[in-house]
């Protein structure tokens, strides 16, 4: 196997045809990273979402945006419709964007409320851990225990940035 670096820019909405298969590129801004690209296999109603959504794993949000993720999911679902969503990690699912979006909202919304109420990140973390959208994943999600504090902190920082 020979690794070949990308040699052209891919644009949102661009399509590539390979025989009977057409691939459509989707980019709606920052979600997991600023350069998230999803690839829809048009005839099969399957979209590879990469790390934009994960199944039973917490995503690295260091360069991402919670609000951007929610907007990305909405735009992608509106453009692509009902799909089998294939994550970069975990099993494909028709409900992946909804399910992972609910989990991410369970982190972001309590952080936003803590910021709006003038409470610290510790309160946000406690409320995130009590949120049923998050709590139901605490025992089974890969990387949950070692990463949830960091992701609450990132959500809190993003909420603070938006509030100012």
Which stretches of residues belong to each language-model region?
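Acidic/polar short surface loop at catalytic or gating sites that assists cofactor/ion binding
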Residues: 1-4
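Metallo-beta-lactamase
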Residues: 15, 22, 27-113
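Short acidic-hydrophobic, aromatic-tinged amphipathic segments that line or gate anion-handling sites
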Residues: 8-12
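Short, well-ordered alpha-helix to beta-strand connector turns
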Residues: 6-7, 82
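Detector for Asparagine
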Residues: 7, 55-56, 60, 127, ...
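Accessory terminal helices/loops
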Residues: 78-80, 93-164
């Amino acid at each position: 196997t020979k690794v070949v670096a990308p040699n052209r820019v891919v644009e949102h909405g661009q399509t590539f045809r390979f025989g009977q298969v057409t691939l459509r590129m989707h980019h709606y801004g920052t979600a997991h990273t600023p350069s998230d690209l999803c690839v829809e296999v048009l005839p099969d109603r399957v979209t590879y979402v990469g790390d934009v959504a994960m199944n039973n794993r917490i995503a690295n949000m260091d360069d991402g945006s919670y609000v951007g993720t929610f907007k990305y999911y909405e735009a992608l679902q509106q453009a692509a419709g009902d799909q089998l969503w294939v994550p970069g990690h975990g099993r494909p699912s028709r409900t992946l964007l909804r399910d992972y979006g609910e989990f991410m909202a369970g982190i972001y919304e309590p952080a936003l409320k803590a910021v709006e109420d003038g409470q610290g990140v510790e309160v946000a973390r406690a409320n995130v851990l009590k949120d049923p959208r998050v709590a139901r994943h605490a025992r089974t999600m890969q990387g949950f225990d070692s990463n949830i504090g960091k992701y609450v902190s990132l959500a809190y920082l993003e909420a603070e940035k938006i509030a100012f």
